[in-house]
Swiss-Prot record:
Function field: Cleaves peptides in various proteins in a process that requires ATP hydrolysis. Has a chymotrypsin-like activity. Plays a major role in the degradation of misfolded proteins.
Family assignment from sequence similarity: Belongs to the peptidase S14 family.
Record keywords, A-Z: Chloroplast, Hydrolase, Plastid, Protease, Serine protease
Protein name: ATP-dependent Clp protease proteolytic subunit
EC numbers on record: 3.4.21.92
Organism phylogeny: Eukaryota, Viridiplantae, Streptophyta, Zygnematophyceae, Zygnematophycidae
Subunit structure: Component of the chloroplastic Clp protease core complex.
Gene that encodes the chain: clpP
Length: 211
């Protein structure tokens, strides 16, 4: 039987008794964000809202986004990426499990030098796909033009964030390209790979201990 989202005690400053809140809300208070599902408008709006709130609350403390996502909607992913660049604090990105498609796009949007992959994480890049399969020819042409614009946008971001030539990015995105954590580091999508003998990035609650 599913147990739902675990709850943990949290005491609001100034109050004597702790209340029970879900674990994600507790971690948000320590500027830890989670993308653990398909990228869609709902999760994108949640992440953007949290980042904007935390930005207004304290612009000197970094944020940490943990990613385990197969990807999803292109515009939703781009909106999260743009918000990460908009907020003043640095946003660390940490890949756990899989960061594919828009998941890898968001992963590479973390502050350069502060993008981390766990040792057995996987990363995948490919070009944006159209979801418009039926309709008038004119509508298909309009959508095809939009997909090409989105592909150009995504390719340019990967180029800027990885340092790879645009021709290399464009060629690699023509198909699904899977990478290990070390391969993603060599490609420039992440900067660090956590290992047993290296500390990861420092985060609240001693999340910076050795993995």
């Amino acid at each position: 039987m599913p147990i739902g989202v675990p709850k943990v005690p949290f005491r609001i400053p100034g109050e004597e008794d702790a209340s029970w809140i879900d674990v994600y809300n507790r971690l948000y208070r320590d500027r830890l964000l989670f993308l653990g599902q398909d990228v869609d408008d709902e999760i994108a709006n949640q992440l953007i809202g949290i980042m904007i709130y935390l930005n207004g609350e304290n612009q000197s403390k970094d944020m940490y986004m943990y990613i385990n996502s197969p990807g999803g909607a292109v515009l939703a992913g781009i909106s999260v990426y743009d918000a990460m660049q908009f907020v003043v604090p640095d946003v660390h990105t940490i890949c756990m499990g899989l960061a594919a498609s828009m998941g890898s796009f968001i992963l590479t949007g973390g502050e350069i030098s502060k993008r981390l992959a766990l040792p057995h994480a996987r990363v995948m890049i490919h070009q944006p796909a159209s979801s418009f399969y039926e309709g008038q020819a004119g509508e298909c042409m309009i959508e095809a033009e939009e997909v090409l614009k989105l592909k150009d946008c995504v390719t340019k971001v990967y180029m800027q964030r990885t340092g790879k030539p645009m021709a290399v990015i464009s060629e690699d995105m023509e198909r699904d390209v899977f990478m290990s954590a070390k391969e993603a580091q060599a490609y420039g999508i992440v900067d660090l790979v956590a290992t047993d003998d290296e500390p990861s990035t420092n985060t609240p609650f001693d999340y910076g201990r050795k993995w």
